[in-house]
């Protein structure tokens, strides 16, 4: 059975990717700040993780390593976007967007690389 890890799964595209992957008989690992939407679906392993928090990411990877998880597909779907015009966007909002969309995605990928099968895909 192939394993897929998807970030940003509490709603929208990430949520639907998990549901579709489960229907295709993948082992599904969901990573999201809010894991509640998928927690009660049998066959989906949910992790509540803020990808901007390096300690939480390290704990996630250590847990997956302890369970001897090998990842075949990594889908970096987590993202942050505020519906604001450029001139109204605060520094904090820009920073949060980059922390999630750039640094968080890079860090989760970097930390998960040892668990991704040689034939795996990011």
Specify the residue positions occupied by each region the protein language model found:
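N-terminal Rossmann NAD(P)H-binding glycine-rich loop of SDR-like oxidoreductase domains
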Residues: 10, 18
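Conserved glycine-rich Rossmann-like NAD(P)H-binding loop of the short-chain dehydrogenase/reductase
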Residues: 24-38
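A hydrophobic alpha-helix adjacent to the NAD(P)-binding/active-site core of NAD(P)-dependent oxidoreductases
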Residues: 46, 89, 97-98
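The beta1-alpha1 cofactor-binding region of Rossmann-like NAD(H)/NADP(H)-dependent oxidoreductases
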Residues: 49-59, 91
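Conserved NAD(P)H cofactor-binding loop of Rossmann-fold oxidoreductase domains
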Residues: 77-82
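Substrate-binding pocket helix/loop in short-chain dehydrogenase/reductase
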Residues: 85-86, 93-95
């Amino acid at each position: 059975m192939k394993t897929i890890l998807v970030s940003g799964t509490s709603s929208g595209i990430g949520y639907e990717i998990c549901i579709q992957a489960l229907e295709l008989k993948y082992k599904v690992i969901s990573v999201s700040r809010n894991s509640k939407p998928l927690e009660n679906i049998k066959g989906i392993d949910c992790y509540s993780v803020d990808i901007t928090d390096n300690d939480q990411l390290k704990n996630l990877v250590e847990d997956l390593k302890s369970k001897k998880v090998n990842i075949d597909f990594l889908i970096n779907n987590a993202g942050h976007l505020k519906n604001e015009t450029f001139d109204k966007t605060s520094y904090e909002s820009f920073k949060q967007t980059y922390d999630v969309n750039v640094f968080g995605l890079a860090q989760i990928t970097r930390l998960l690389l040892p668990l991704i099968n040689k034939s795996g895909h990011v």
